[in-house]
Amino acid sequence: LHRDFLYDAKMRGVDWKAARDKYAPLVERVTDRAELNDVLGMMVAEVGALHSQIRPGELRRTEQEGAPAGLGAVLARTNEGYRVEHVYRSEAELPSARAPLSRPEVDVKEGDVITAVNGKDVLGARDISDLLLNQADKQVLLQVKRGNGKGAPRAVIVTPVNMAKQTALRYGDWELSRAEQVAAASQGRIGYLHLRAMGANDIASFARDFYANINREGLIIDVRRNNGGNIDSWIIEKLLRKAWAYWAPPGVQPSSNMQNTFRGHLVVLVDELTYSDGETFAAGIKALKLAPLVGKRTAGAGVWLSDNTRLADNGMARVAENGQFGIDGQWLIEGVGVVPDVEVDNPPHATFNGGDRQLEVALDMLAKKLKEQPRPAFQAQPIPALK
């Protein structure tokens, strides 16, 4: 498959037949599909293409002992029970995406203490997570008492979520904290949006957050940890739109034509986990000189793949097929990543404690830009009287 579909017909200078001969003897020692995946993966790694991945087909799977679930909150064990330290927040416009403990029918506040789950004392268990095993999407009865000590303990019905949703809730809470930091530091002059990936959900996320910030004087687009997809051109097209005129109905703030154009200053955040289409987006921003990039060099996965290379057992040996080069003919991204204009590291200890040096630098850059080049206001000349 790699011989026939890899973006470089010369196999990056690798003798592919010799690579096959090198790993073929290991096939006789393979006992299951997982071991075959290892052999295939080692052989594919010889060509050093990041978008070449092995996906298993049919595997023997052990029966799961228990699927963990969460309440969408940070809990701390105390001598009374589990105190609700923080409930993960979500977009106000997406009520269905709320954390279990933040839903309107659930009367639990930060500081409250959970004392029992389905009638079992939480302090009698190794951890509250043991009592939530296999409870995702099922109604669970909590015994909760107020953190201020007032009132009798009460029963609360809540529906936990699986770990994928728990992780997404935590991620969303982090996104909101970044947006709040930007709004507070800039007195509302600068907006913020984060793109987790470049897929269908991220189209909705971008549309919701970008147009809400369309009239800000500055904007930070954060693609750190972005794991790719295929919407970079769609986003860049929105950023390329320019206002050339303004509609001015009586008593209403003028609006631009082209419609929904962002007229402010822009900064894009990247890091070493910005991957695939997140990198293509960053490369496009840099090539078109739309904004400075701040952060760390990206992962270097610049050759895209397809899912057309399925195997007999429905597994897949994904091949990096679609290389990309710039208008100067130079190959882009693969193996080298996208280098930021301003390199900034996030120190681990400070980051663990809530710091975000990369975001702070982006804010400082925009504040300086707004001072040096303030965005011109909509200002029409007086309408001439009829002669």
What are these regions (language model features)?
Residues 361, 365-387:
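Gram-negative outer-membrane assembly/targeting C-terminal domains
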Residues 50-96:
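PDZ/PDZ-like peptide-tail recognition elements
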Residues 109-113:
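Structural motif
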Residues 343-350:
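C-terminal or mid-to-C-terminal helical accessory/interaction module adjacent to the motor/catalytic core
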Residues 1-53, 77-83, 93, 376, ...:
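Terminal targeting/pro-maturation regions of precursor/exported proteins
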Residues 179-180, 274-276, 312-343:
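Metal-dependent DNA phosphodiester-chemistry modules and their immediately adjacent helices/loops
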Residues 43, 193, 330, 362:
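A residue-level signal for conserved active-site and pocket-lining positions in enzyme catalytic cores
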Residues 2-7, 11, 83, 91-101, ...:
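Cleft-lining beta-strand/loop regions that shape enzyme active-site pockets
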